[in-house]
Design a protein with these regions (language model features):
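Active-site phosphate-binding and catalytic loops of NTP-dependent enzymes
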Residues: 31-33, 100, 172-176, 199-211
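Conserved G1/Walker A P-loop phosphate-binding module
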Residues: 1-76, 80-82
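P-loop NTP-binding site
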Residues: 185-294
Length: 294
């Protein structure tokens, strides 16, 4: 039996639906999703296994002009997506006209590997607008195969996955056949808490936050978690905690509910808030939190 395996890397502007697409492919909620830009900070692998294939999907941060060291590290994750891909997915949304970084766009149109351009959120368009967008992207990225999809509604997602399987090279599996991702449990705890902060706080607060899980103890029925929420200033610490701890308690309750669904066990979670001044511009702290891969 012929076995296929390969890396399928997803890139695009912020908030075009990259994480929604990967979750749809994998069938699990590996990447957190919010309406805020820069929700995805790391490169996250999701693995889909079949008897004769292994598809390794990579969700990457949205492409931006970096303003500080953490964002530079995020863009390094995107650059690495060009280096090991067997198939490249360039994801755009209805109404979008260009990638925010010309250098990345040039890499796409000169790619030596198959490129699938997925025109997402077509449920928000009419037929005339859709046809105009398809013509636009055919001209801009002539080397790409174009698929109109709705990742949220699962429209055309199976068709795209079938095409990916056709394009993958013959290869043995790269990961164990029961693997779902390359990330450890603590990573998903951190991301779940960060998602709830993104959903519950406004302005700069969500972007100044990093999560570190110091304790993850699992037995047959319960997982005990101790996590620290890092912020950059004392004022941010006060906002995260809220009046009499109400805001932090709300985040903890929401995170616990999602983590119990994810792990299938009862969760006991403790969260604390600490000030870690200017961590987003500290190379030492970025390495500690898994951003700096150099």
């Amino acid at each position: 039996m012929i076995h296929k395996a390969g890396f399928v890397n997803i890139i695009g502007n912020p908030n075009v639906g990259k994480s929604t697409l990967m979750n749809a492919f994998v069938g699990e909620r590996l990447s957190i999703i919010t309406s805020k830009a820069q929700t995805t900070r790391h490169r996250i692998l999701g693995i889909v296994n079949g008897d004769d294939f292994q598809v390794i999907l990579s969700d990457t941060p949205g492409i931006i002009k970096p303003a500080y060291e953490m964002q530079k590290s995020m863009m390094d994750f995107v650059k690495s997506a060009f280096e090991d891909a067997d198939v490249l997915i360039y994801m755009v949304e209805i109404g979008e006209k260009e990638l925010k970084d010309e250098a990345f766009f040039n890499k796409i149109i000169h790619a030596k590997i198959p490129v699938l351009l997925l025109l997402n959120k077509i449920d928000k368009s009419d037929q005339e607008q859709l046809e105009e967008q398809i013509d636009l992207w055919k001209e801009k990225v002539p080397n790409a195969e174009i698929y109109p999809i709705s990742a949220l509604e699962n429209f055309n997602v199976k068709e795209v996955f079938a095409r990916i399987l056709e394009l993958l090279p013959e290869s043995p599996a790269y990961y164990p056949k029961d693997a779902l991702t390359d990330k450890p449990e603590r990573f998903f705890v951190n991301e779940t808490i960060r998602e709830k902060i993104l959903l519950n706080y406004d302005k700069e607060i969500p972007y100044a936050v990093e999560i570190e899980t110091e304790e993850f103890i699992e037995d047959d029925k319960i997982i005990r978690i101790r996590s620290v929420i890092m912020v950059e200033r004392d004022t941010q610490k006060g906002i995260i905690i809220g009046h009499k701890g109400a805001a932090l308690k709300r985040v903890g309750m929401q995170a616990r509910e999602d983590l119990e669904k994810f792990f299938g066990k009862q969760i006991h979670i403790e969260m604390f808030v600490k000030v870690n001044k200017d961590w987003r511009n500290s190379q030492f702290q970025l390495r500690r939190f898994g951003y700096n891969q150099k």
